[in-house]
From Swiss-Prot:
Gene3D superfamilies: Aspartate/ornithine carbamoyltransferase. Pathway: Pyrimidine metabolism; UMP biosynthesis via de novo pathway; (S)-dihydroorotate from bicarbonate: step 2/3. L-aspartate binds at residues 87, 172, 224. Its EC number is 2.1.3.2. This is Aspartate carbamoyltransferase catalytic subunit. It catalyses: carbamoyl phosphate + L-aspartate = N-carbamoyl-L-aspartate + phosphate + H(+). One of its GO terms (molecular function) is aspartate carbamoyltransferase activity. One of its GO terms (biological process) is 'de novo' UMP biosynthetic process. InterPro entries: Asp/Orn_carbamoyltranf_P-bd (IPR006132), Asp/Orn_carbamoylTrfase (IPR006130), Asp/Orn_carbamoylTrfase_sf (IPR036901), Asp_carbamoyltransf (IPR002082), Asp_carbamoyltransf_Asp/Orn-bd (IPR006131).
Length: 307
């Protein structure tokens, strides 16, 4: 390995819940270090990785690809549409095959919650598993890039007031973030349609209408309305959702001077956020995308350090 500062070693990367606060902070600081000194990365041997995405993705998929290229990894192409999955091959057998072929890392996005548990429990699968999102379960790499973005802005988490707003029930981003942010000392609030709020969130924070939050918070974390995961529960027109729960131009005026706006993207413009605000001064949405590459470099380094 060319660099000396990255010492964190992880067998797999499937959920931030499984990492200690120290390990999470190590990943955050390494991400920022890579961003500030991108020449200080790489390995002195070849590693092989494949990105196996069974759900649509732009940012996660392409930023993992970019991270892999920057690290000098050998990427093996995988397309679910042209693979034996269409012949009925299970995810387990697909990854068993990839492991047998000698892949060091499998980055996977799959619609099944906790799909990775069977894979990491298998004595015959030797590839490191990196979770690129499991249905409406977890999205740990997105959560890490969000943490990096917040830490870059404020330099701490303890005492920060963070509102997570929108499609809470269906959001793997929300689940990953509420858990780790509370653990790191942030004060969490929730808002959005009550139909998409569950009592399971009560242990992490308090639900309040968005108009009671905008002038009180440090971070406004908006969530995409996930139409593809809805079963008809809580149907809103774009206009009504935006006016009731979205970041309108009027609500934007009430944000603190130091507050920032975040969104995991893709953004439904004029639904979760007014289109003109996506690149506003307080918005960090584009920065999140950029930070995704550095966060995923840190993740890949950590799992390859255990090889």
């Amino acid at each position: 390995m060319n660099h000396q500062t990255q010492t964190l070693s992880l067998e797999h990367f499937v959920s931030l819940e499984e990492l200690s606060n120290q390990e999470v902070m190590s990943l955050i600081k390494r991400s920022i270090e890579v961003k500030e000194n991108p020449s200080n990365i790489g390995f002195d041997k070849d590693y092989y990785v494949s990105n196996l995405f069974f759900e649509n993705s732009t940012r996660t998929h392409k930023s993992f690809e970019m991270a892999e290229l920057k690290l000098g990894l050998k990427t093996i192409e995988f397309n679910a549409d042209t693979s034996s999955v269409n012949k009925g091959e299970t995810l387990y057998d697909t990854i068993l095959t990839m492991s047998a072929l000698g892949l060091d890392v499998c980055v996977i996005r799959h619609p099944d919650i906790d799909y990775y548990k069977e894979l990491i429990a298998s004595p015959n699968i030797h590839s490191a598993i990196v979770n690129g999102g499991d249905g409406s379960g977890q999205h740990p790499s997105q959560s890490l890039l969000d943490l990096v973005t917040i830490y870059e802005e404020f330099g701490y988490f303890k005492g920060l007031k963070i509102a997570i707003v929108g499609d809470l029930t269906h959001s793997r981003v929300a689940k990953s973030n509420m858990q780790v942010l509370k653990r790191l000392g942030a004060e969490i609030f929730f808002s959005g349609p009550k139909e998409w709020y569950s009592s399971q969130f009560d242990e992490y924070g308090q639900y309040l209408p968005i108009d009671q939050l905008v002038d009180q918070i440090d971070v406004l974390m908006l969530l995409r309305v996930q139409h593809e995961r809805h079963d008809g529960k809580g149907v809103f027109s774009k206009e009504s959702y935006h006016q009731q729960f979205g970041l309108t131009k009027e609500r934007y005026k009430h944000l603190r001077d130091t507050a920032i706006i975040m969104h995991p993207a893709p953004v439904n413009r004029d639904v979760e956020i007014a289109s003109d605000l996506v690149e506003a001064d307080k918005a960090r949405i584009v920065k999140q995308m950029s930070n995704g590459v550095y966060a995923r470099i840190a993740i890949l380094e950590a799992v390859l350090n255990s090889r």
